[in-house]
A protein has these predicted regions:
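The feature captures the beta-strand-to-loop junction immediately N-terminal to the Walker
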Residues: 40-42
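Helix-to-loop junction immediately C-terminal to a conserved catalytic motif
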Residues: 55
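Conserved ABC ATPase "signature" region
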Residues: 118-143, 191
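Catalytic Walker B motif of ABC-type/P-loop ATPase nucleotide-binding domains
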Residues: 172-176
């Protein structure tokens, strides 16, 4: 029986084992629609496995994973989950470096188009407006004709977030966006993700505590595949168990 929930994402009692190692161990997590949530934890805590689980790359051995209270993600494949409205941005940008920002955005337009057919076809007015709005939202409106390979690392991350937005996701899964960014890019990225929350549910997996602090959102600490603590960053940072296993003090 599917639990009654209006949450964007609902994970209950999820466990995943690889060759006897429990990557997730009775993990339970719930995110409200439009929420921004940071997920932190030491290496091997289960953060990446959790994202793999939500996107259908990994199947749970036990547990429930619901999207919008009605879609059982454990029964769907990666394409079906993406089409429902769950988008993932990996740590390393996948921007095509030989084409422009505009053309990268065009490739990402949702709809039944093959990638290179998208590039060649004439955009309608609605498409152009949407792409311009997204470029402006991610701070790339002045770089729209710039070749992808000439962008800074931070700009590539923003472009990839823009490409995800064009797919109209309900949930954005963002994996370590601050890695390799300058301080100013890091703060701008935090501002962007705060702005996206509300319109989208945003999960950010991150190691940079200054970046997490800038997000100003609820924090979930994972350890050994389950939730160790939740709350504001100041709250979890003062938790003795978190200090012991994560902060190393």
């Amino acid at each position: 029986m599917i639990p009654v929930t209006r949450s964007a994402l609902y994970l209950d009692g999820v466990s995943v084992a690889f060759d006897g190692f429990k990557a997730l161990n009775d993990l339970s997590l719930e995110l409200a629609q439009g929420e921004l949530r940071a997920v932190i934890g030491p290496n091997g805590a289960g953060k990446s496995t959790m994202l793999d689980l939500i996107t259908g790359k990994t199947r749970p051995d036990t547990g429930v994973v619901l999207f919008l209270g009605q879609h059982d993600l454990t029964s769907l494949d990666e394409v079906e989950i993406a089409n429902l409205g769950i988008g993932r941005k990996f740590q390393k940008p996948s921007v095509i470096e030989t084409i422009s920002v505009w053309e990268n955005l065009e490739l990402a337009l949702s709809g039944n188009r093959s990638p290179w057919r998208s590039v060649m076809q004439i955009l309608n007015l609605q498409d152009r407006r949407l792409m311009k709005d997204v470029a402006d939202r991610v701070g790339l409106s002045d770089s729209i004709d710039q070749i992808g390979g000439s962008l800074s690392h931070g700009q590539k991350q923003w472009l990839e977030i823009g490409m995800l937005l064009l797919q109209e996701p309900e949930v954005l899964l963002i994996d370590e966006p601050a890695a390799g960014m300058t301080d100013s890019e890091t703060m701008k990225t935090a501002e962007l993700l705060r702005d996206l929350a509300g319109d989208h549910t945003v999960i950010v997996v991150e190691h940079d505590m200054e970046f997490v602090e800038a997000l100003g959102c609820k924090v979930t600490v994972l350890h050994e595949g389950c939730v160790l603590a939740e709350g504001s960053l100041s709250h979890v940072s003062s938790n003795n168990e978190v200090i012991e296993v994560y902060l190393g003090r």
